[in-house]
Amino acid sequence: MATTVKVLAKELKRTAPDLLEQLKAAGIEKGSEDDSITEKDKTVLLEHLQKEHGSAETGARKKITLIKRENSEIRQADSAGRTRTVQVEVRKKRVLVKRSDEAAALEVEEAPAKVIAPTEPVKSILSAEELEKRAAEATRQAELLARQEAEMKAAEEARQKEVAAPVVEKEEKPVDNAPDAAATAAEKKATADKAAKDLAATKEKELADIRVRRAAAEAEALAIRDMMSAPARVLKAPSEIAAEEAKKGTLHKPAKPEGADDKKKAVAKVGGKTIKSAETSSTWQEEGAKKPGGLKTRGDSSGGVGGWRSGGGRKKQRQIAEANVDTNFQVPTEPVVRDVHVPETITVAELAHAMAVKSAEVIKLLMGMGQMVTINQVLDQDTAMIIVEEMGHTAHAAKLDDPDLDLGTDGHDAELLPRPPVVTVMGHVDHGKTSLLDKIRAAKVATGEAGGITQHIGAYHVETPRGMITFLDTPGHEAFTAMRARGAKATDIVILVVAADDGVMPQTKEAIHHALAGGVPIVVAINKIDKPEANSERVKTELVAEQVVPEEYGGDVPFIPVSAKTGEGIDALLENVLLQAEILELKAAKDAPAQGLVIEARLDKGKGPVATILVQSGTLKRGDMLLAGSTYGRVRAMLDENGKPCNEAGPSIPVEIQGLGDVPAAGESVQVVPDERKAREIALFRQGKFRDVKLAKQQAFKLETMMENMEEGAVEAKLLPVIIKADVQGSQEALAQSLMKLSTPEVKVQIVHAGVGGITETDVNLAVASKAVIFGFNSRADAAARKLAENNGVDIRYHNIIYDAVDEVKLALSGMLTPDKKEEITGLVEIRQVFLVSKVGAIAGCLVVDGIVKRTSSVRLLRDNVVIWTGELDSLKRFKDDAKEVRAGVECGLSLKGYNDIKEGDQLEVFEVTEVARSL
């Protein structure tokens, strides 16, 4: 409702014409008393009336009053020795006066004749109001002195005129008696001159005194103005003052908190009397000039904090001092989110300590998840990370070997230099691999190194015009597969040897799968091109089917035709290998502790454990302490590829060493450690705590646990990796095609390797690396493969009928499918009456109309046949007893979990959600 002039005049108890005149005077044009008045018009009218009566404020607030209260406790011991606590409240008040800009502009600043200023910084102990008064007084004194000086100058000029006037008159009079008149005139003139000189000297002295006083007054006024215009220290917050004082503390004597700053103050001697200095808190400096020192306590400088007595020795005094220290502690208002690094295994107590919570909280959460644990229970990494996430913290997977964290750090600052490539020659045994290696050795190894290849080391290097190449001649592919299964990459480039007259064979495909899975570049050497039946184009076509595309077909794999018999193409093959090495930019540190890999190891009856080491970075020297997996030892002897002793080996150089305490496993990483103590510590750590972790890593996926190991809710399709070995090529191809047809957009069959023949150790190692299941169709595993599969937990399935194999894979894929959820309505409940119970909420008295109601069932709340809420039951009772279920026709009482908006006449629809397994 708008306010009119008439209504406003009635509220102000004035007549409407008078109010119209006042509005007109304020610049508000209103024609009649029925015109409306806005809030803006009222504000303008109020300002006009205040200005007219002289009560309007022309500026902002000029004074700000600060009131500070400090509460403290004083502990004193009475005559009986008992300590009592006295509550003390100190109130401090301060008024800040803000100077107006107009007053500051009107002040006339004159350069002083002589500036009398203190050499030290001026420390104000006066209030702003007192300083302003003093500045005004100094200005008035300067003006008064200037006026007095002007008046004295005018009086002096007038007096000189009066002295000179009688002399002139006497000169004008007629001279009756010339001698007497002349003598009298001379005497009077001398007297007048002397009086004038005395008066002038007196006036000059007075003027000099006035000038000195004026200069002093102006200097004082200037100093006061500088003090007032300087930045006020009182605007600094107490927390900032405490922070600055804390920075001045030392390690052994920290800075004193703000609450205890009155214990030690500077003491000055003035006239033999001890007084407090003005070095108090800068916020309350004015009170230091107005009030006397602290409490008088018989010479106690602590202001009475210590009481009348000593307080029971140093311990008591220390407790009193600690009680009065202000720690500035602030209770956190938000939950603290911590970054928790979770290792492979961790106990409940260690996990609680990492999250800074009590162990009972972690145990309670685990009990809610269905696990009964104690504080010493060991949790795996996945469970521990779930606990950390549930408690609102951020979980990070820690590194596996904590003692190994500092290994290899010595070589980080070393210069990285180019190293020779490590090349593995792979292929079918009948395709001339050994002949090709012999040809390379005979062509590139110096005559001084003549002789057969040292078979027990299985590795050597050759020199070419463009650099050196290290070859690994391991028997079969077991070592290469084992290395990839352990996460190591010992090989940089793979030379795939394929016979031009035989084409791609099963072992050739296996080698391709190994290389592609390890991400190692391939150089194809088409051997036996000197034979009449050689067909290089057929080999290229077959390799394209295995995802090995030559460069002339648009791929990235170089194909080099060679002949191990005539030596044709050997130089081109080595040239392409070095070209691939340049593309990879292989570098390693030379002046650093050696790191490498175990190529193969054996137990010699005369030498003990012997291991072939490939140095990957650094330099291995004789006498170094070497750590290989869980075994260690000092290098007692070192042999090169020709069986000759050597003292050191650089990057990409294979050597055979002696001195380890046990035979290491093939593929284990080796590291030079500083001393034996460090090596023993890490070896024992790996043998003990991580034995279970190692076994867990070696567990392959089994058909029975496939659904548990797969990630739930993954967007990408789930894969079932399999390895197929059959008796004949036709059966292997038929089985592979039948299994591939089972793939759907949700689950797919991934054939890691399919071959012909028995199941070998190579197949088991490949299954460990790819977590695959091995299917043997009319083929069996040998003794070594069975033992390796049993140790690593690889699942091997034997079948004689192809349909049985297809049905088993189909069943496994069905288990990997996400189950469907189906709802089934089990009952209907009608709410007859609603009771409100404090601390519980709304309780519904119900009648089961149809079906059955269970305590664990889910419900929907229906109001006028419209679903308004879906949830669970909080409680279900029959009379006063808890009930697990209530059937149709029986009354019961129930409450809903987290919902109280229920009314009489509502209905509850009871349903259960069941999971239905899907099938292909």
From Swiss-Prot:
Ranges of biased composition (kind: Gly residues): 301-311
Domain tr-type G span(s) in chain numbering: 418-585
Family, per entry: Belongs to the TRAFAC class translation factor GTPase superfamily. Classic translation factor GTPase family. IF-2 subfamily.
Natural source organism: Polynucleobacter asymbioticus (strain DSM 18221 / CIP 109841 / QLW-P1DMWA-1) (Polynucleobacter necessarius subsp. asymbioticus)
UniProt-listed NCBIfam families: IF-2 (TIGR00487), small_GTP (TIGR00231)
A Pfam family: IF2_assoc
Region spans: G4: 527-530
Protein's cellular compartments: Cytoplasm
Single GO molecular function: GTPase activity
G1, as annotated region: 427-434
Keywords: Cytoplasm, GTP-binding, Initiation factor, Nucleotide-binding, Protein biosynthesis
GO CC terms of this entry: cytosol
Annotated spans, G3: 473-476
Protein name, as recorded: Translation initiation factor IF-2
Alphabetical list of SUPFAM superfamilies matching this protein: Initiation factor IF2/eIF5b, domain 3, P-loop containing nucleoside triphosphate hydrolases, Putative DNA-binding domain, Translation proteins
Disordered: annotated segments: 149-197, 245-319
Region (G5): 563-565
Skewed-composition ranges (Basic and acidic residues): 149-175, 186-197, 255-265
Function per UniProt: One of the essential components for the initiation of protein synthesis. Protects formylmethionyl-tRNA from spontaneous hydrolysis and promotes its binding to the 30S ribosomal subunits. Also involved in the hydrolysis of GTP during the formation of the 70S ribosomal complex.
